[in-house]
C-alpha cells in the first residue's frame, strides 16, 4: 500500500432536523393542544487512532466527508432520529490541524483515542416548547442548526524511540533488519528506502523499543536535493538519533564530510531536532582490512571532533549490533524513569517536544511551499521557451491572419 503521511480533507457535520408544529387530534379529547416533536441532532465526525491503519492514503482520494442530517420531528411529541456519526480511522501518531487557524485540534498517540472534529447541529424545537397560559395553540417551531464545517490537515509522524539517520546506502536498512524483525528493502543503489520503516527491537524478553528507518539524506536536502527533508519530521517524536556512517562509501567520498553534511542538513531543518541525543555508529567495518580499522575509525572521529557515544558495527555480519541495542535500551529506560520520578524534568521534556513539533511542522510547510513555487517557476519558464511569439513582437517573422466580414 502506498505510504501517505499528509492529507487535507473537509469535514461537514450533519444539520439538525427541524422541529414541527403539530396538534393532538384524538376522539373525545377536545383542545388536545400542541404535540410537535423536536428535530434530531445531526451526526458528528470523529477521528480515531487505529493500530491496524498505517497510512493516510484513503484521504488522498476521499477529501470531502459528511455526516448524516438529523430527521425532522413528528406529531405525538416524537423526536426525530439523530444523524449517524462518522468515525474516520487514522494511524496512531496522527496530528489534526485546523488549516484556517493553524491550531492543533488533537494529537492521537494511543490506539482507540478519539477526537471530535465537527459537531453535529442541534435539532429544532417543536411547537410544544412554545405553549403558555396565554398561547395554548402555538404554531411556532424552529429549524435545526447547521452542522460544523471545517478544513483540516492530517499529519502522520511515526512513533518511535530511536530514529536512524544517515546518507543513502549507509546501511540503515541493513542495520534495522539485523536488530529487529523489520524487513525493509536492501539493495546496492541509493534511495532504496522510499518510505519510513518501523521495527520493534527486543533487548531481551521483557525489554524492547521501537526504531524508525527513514530515507537517506544528502547534502542540499534542505533545498530539495534527493528526497528533500519531507521525511525528517518523522524523527520529531524520537528520543535518540542513531547516526549511521558508512566508513567506506562506494562512491569514494569522505565519511567525515558526509557525516558533517547530514548534521548541517539536520540543523537547517530544525535546530531543536539537532539537539536530540545522538549516537554515532561507524558501519560497514567489514569493508576495511582488519589491521587498519582502528586507525581509519579514529581518523573519522578526529575529523568530526566527536566526543559523544560511538559504536563500530557491521550490519551485514551483525557484528557489534547487540552492544548498540543494549546501550539504547538503557538510555531509553533511564529517560522514562526520570520522567516518572521528576515532574520538573517531565515538564521540560513536554515543553521541548511541543517546541520540536511546532518547529518541524513550520519547516515542513515552508519546504513544501518553496517546492511548489520552484515547480511553478519551472513551468512558466518552459511555457515561455515553447512560445516563440510570447513577447508579441511584430518583427519576428510570424504570420498574422486577419479575418474581415464582407
Swiss-Prot record:
SUPFAM superfamilies: Obg GTP-binding protein N-terminal domain (SSF82051), P-loop containing nucleoside triphosphate hydrolases (SSF52540). Residues 120-143, 381-406 are annotated as: Disordered. GTP binds at residues 166-173, 191-195, 213-216, 283-286, 314-316. The keyword Cytoplasm applies. GO terms for biological process: ribosome biogenesis. One of its GO terms (cellular component) is cytoplasm. InterPro entries: G_OBG (IPR031167), GTP-bd (IPR006073), GTP-bd_Obg/CgtA (IPR014100), GTP1-OBG_CS (IPR006074), GTP1_OBG_dom (IPR006169), GTP1_OBG_dom_sf (IPR036726), OBG_GTPase (IPR045086), P-loop_NTPase (IPR027417). It is found in: Cytoplasm. Residues 1-159 form the Obg domain. Residues 383-399 have a biased composition (Acidic residues). Its cofactor is Mg(2+). It comes from the Bacteria. Keywords: Cytoplasm, GTP-binding, Hydrolase, Magnesium, Metal-binding, Nucleotide-binding. Pfam families: GTP1_OBG, MMR_HSR1. Residues 160-333 form the OBG-type G domain. It is an enzyme of class 3 (hydrolase). Mg(2+) binds at residues 173, 193. Its EC number is 3.6.5.-. GO terms for molecular function: GTP binding; GTPase activity; magnesium ion binding. An essential GTPase which binds GTP, GDP and possibly (p)ppGpp with moderate affinity, with high nucleotide exchange rates and a fairly low GTP hydrolysis rate. Plays a role in control of the cell cycle, stress response, ribosome biogenesis and in those bacteria that undergo differentiation, in morphogenesis control. PANTHER family: DEVELOPMENTALLY REGULATED GTP-BINDING PROTEIN-RELATED, MITOCHONDRIAL RIBOSOME-ASSOCIATED GTPASE 2. Monomer. Belongs to the TRAFAC class OBG-HflX-like GTPase superfamily. OBG GTPase family. This is GTPase Obg.
Amino acid at each position: 500500500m502506498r505510504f501517505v503521511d499528509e492529507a487535507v480533507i473537509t469535514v461537514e457535520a450533519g444539520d439538525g432536523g427541524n422541529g414541527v408544529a403539530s396538534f393532538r387530534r384524538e376522539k373525545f379529547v377536545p383542545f388536545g393542544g400542541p404535540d410537535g416533536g423536536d428535530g434530531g441532532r445531526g451526526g458528528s465526525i470523529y477521528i480515531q487512532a487505529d493500530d491496524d491503519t498505517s497510512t493516510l492514503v484513503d484521504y488522498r482520494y476521499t477529501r470531502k466527508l459528511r455526516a448524516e442530517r438529523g430527521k425532522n420531528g413528528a406529531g405525538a411529541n416524537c423526536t426525530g432520529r439523530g444523524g449517524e456519526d462518522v468515525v474516520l480511522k487514522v494511524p496512531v501518531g496522527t496530528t489534526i490541524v485546523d488549516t484556517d487557524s493553524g491550531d492543533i485540534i488533537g494529537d492521537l498517540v494511543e490506539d482507540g483515542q478519539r477526537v471530535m472534529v465537527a459537531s453535529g447541529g442541534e435539532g429544532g424545537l417543536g411547537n410544544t416548547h412554545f405553549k403558555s397560559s396565554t398561547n395554548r395553540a402555538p404554531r411556532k417551531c424552529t429549524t435545526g442548526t447547521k452542522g460544523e464545517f471545517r478544513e483540516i490537515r492530517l499529519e502522520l509522524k511515526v512513533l518511535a524511540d530511536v530514529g536512524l539517520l544517515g546518507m543513502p546506502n549507509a546501511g540503515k536498512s541493513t542495520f534495522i533488519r539485523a536488530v529487529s524483525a523489520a524487513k525493509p528493502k536492501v539493495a546496492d543503489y541509493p534511495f532504496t528506502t522510499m518510505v519510513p520503516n518501523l521495527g520493534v527491537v527486543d533487548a531481551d524478553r521483557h525489554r524492547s523499543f521501537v526504531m524508525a528507518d527513514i530515507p537517506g539524506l544528502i547534502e542540499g536536502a534542505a533545498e530539495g536535493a534527493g528526497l528533500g527533508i519531507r521525511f525528517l519530521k518523522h524523527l520529531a517524536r524520537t528520543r535518540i538519533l542513531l547516526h549511521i556512517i558508512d566508513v567506506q562509501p562506494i562512491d569514494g567520498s569522505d565519511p567525515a564530510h558526509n557525516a558533517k553534511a547530514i548534521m548541517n542538513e539536520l540543523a537547517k531543518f530544525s535546530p531543536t531536532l539537532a539537539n536530540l541525543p545522538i549516537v554515532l555508529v561507524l558501519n560497514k567495518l567489514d569493508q576495511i582490512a582488519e589491521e587498519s580499522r582502528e586507525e581509519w575509525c579514529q581518523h573519522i572521529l578526529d575529523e568530526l571532533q566527536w566526543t559523544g557515544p560511538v559504536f563500530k558495527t557491521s550490519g551485514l555480519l551483525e557484528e557489534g549490533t547487540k552492544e548498540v541495542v543494549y546501550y539504547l535500551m538503557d538510555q531509553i529506560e533511564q529517560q522514562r524513569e526520570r520522567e516518572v520520578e521528576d515532574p520538573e524534568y517531565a515538564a521540560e521534556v513536554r515543553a521541548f517536544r511541543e517546541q520540536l513539533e511546532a518547529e518541524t511542522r513550520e519547516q515542513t510547510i515552508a519546504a513544501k511551499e518553496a517546492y511548489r513555487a520552484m515547480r511553478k517557476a519551472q513551468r512558466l519558464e518552459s511555457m515561455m521557451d515553447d512560445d516563440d511569439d510570447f513577447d508579441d513582437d511584430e518583427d519576428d517573422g510570424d504570420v498574422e491572419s486577419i479575418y474581415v466580414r464582407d
